[in-house]
């Protein structure tokens, strides 16, 4: 049986003080329409009992976009962001709505990053409240938004952007590289004494036909032992799943619809010729094919 990549990693670590979310990126692949979300923070599931750590901020709606609600995370704000994303608001419209309708009437402490896909048009937007903890900022590109607070400095965000833009391959490759760009001791300054960038992290990618609760790639590190960087744990899992698609190419300039039939003769999917077909089997074997 073929399955999507979904990994949840929880490694016991001692409880630590409460903190806020730190650096993250949301992005859309303009060709495949994949939606991606990745980030990390110097907080974990033990620090915030009952939560999955950094991934708390991430909301992906396959085929529509993603939004991160970070810095003084508020569940009601995130629920509203989700609703507006489903309703077809653009990234900027979602964030503007959140600013003017903050659940606690205090948008100055919030930070948001959003990316949307509406009628083939990708829009990105971000907001950094003036009362977020320094260093704080965000960067926007045509198909991505990068944001962070409690950072070592602007260099963390710049490195994330550079890695994202200059790494070849799939959206997941670029997001993984972007996280690595922030893997600096004390990237979240609260983690400097721990000699890591952060304590929990995530990397998520959705195909346009995925369910929001069943994403194509969903790697979550809720917590790690002392002195183990969660970005390294994600990288190891990413490598184990053989998700590097550096040789990806579209072989046909004019793709045609391809009907995929299972062994019983039932139509199970439609793909375009030239599209990469990527399968992960229960036994761990990875198979990559180009539809012809």
Give the ranges of each region predicted by the language model:
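Bacterial Sec-dependent N-terminal signal peptides
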Residues: 1-21, 245
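N-terminal nucleophile
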Residues: 20-242
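Short coil/loop residues immediately preceding or within conserved phosphate-binding loops
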Residues: 22, 255, 274
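Acidic surface patches and DE-rich sequence motifs
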Residues: 29, 116-119, 262, 270, ...
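Residue-level signal for well-ordered, solvent-exposed loop/turn and beta-edge residues enriched
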Residues: 32-34, 121-123, 246, 266, ...
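Short clusters of small/polar residues that mark proteolytic maturation junctions
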Residues: 39-40, 128-129, 270-272, 290-291
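Residue-level detector of functionally pivotal "anchor" positions at catalytic/ligand-binding pockets or at interdomain
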Residues: 242-268
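C-terminal tail/sorting-segment detector
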Residues: 276-292
């Amino acid at each position: 049986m073929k399955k999507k990549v979904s990994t949840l990693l929880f490694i016991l670590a001692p409880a630590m003080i409460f903190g806020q979310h730190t650096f993250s990126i949301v992005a859309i692949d303009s060709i495949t329409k994949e939606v991606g979300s990745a980030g990390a923070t110097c907080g974990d599931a033990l620090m915030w009992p009952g939560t999955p750590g950094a991934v708390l901020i991430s909301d992906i709606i396959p085929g529509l976009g993603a939004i991160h609600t970070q810095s003084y995370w508020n569940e009601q704000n995130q629920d509203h962001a989700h609703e507006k994303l489903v309703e077809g608001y653009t990234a900027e419209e979602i964030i503007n709505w959140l600013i003017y309708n903050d659940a606690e009437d205090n948008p100055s402490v919030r930070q948001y990053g959003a990316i949307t896909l509406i009628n083939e048009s990708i829009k990105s937007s971000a907001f950094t409240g003036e009362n977020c903890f320094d260093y704080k900022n965000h960067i926007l590109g045509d198909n991505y938004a990068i944001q962070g607070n409690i950072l070592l400095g602007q260099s963390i965000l710049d490195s994330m952007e550079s890695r994202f833009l200059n790494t070849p391959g799939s959206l997941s490759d670029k997001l993984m590289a972007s996280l690595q760009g922030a893997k600096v001791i004390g990237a979240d300054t609260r983690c400097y004494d721990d000699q890591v960038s952060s304590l929990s992290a995530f990397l998520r990618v959705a195909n346009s036909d995925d369910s929001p609760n069943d994403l194509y790639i969903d790697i979550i590190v809720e917590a790690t032992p002392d002195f183990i960087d969660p970005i390294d744990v994600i990288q190891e899992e990413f490598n184990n799943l053989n998700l590097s698609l550096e040789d990806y190419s579209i072989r046909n300039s004019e793709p045609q619809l391809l009907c995929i039939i299972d062994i019983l003769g039932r139509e199970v999917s439609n793909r375009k010729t030239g599209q990469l077909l990527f399968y992960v089997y229960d036994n761990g074997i990875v198979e990559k094919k180009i539809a012809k």
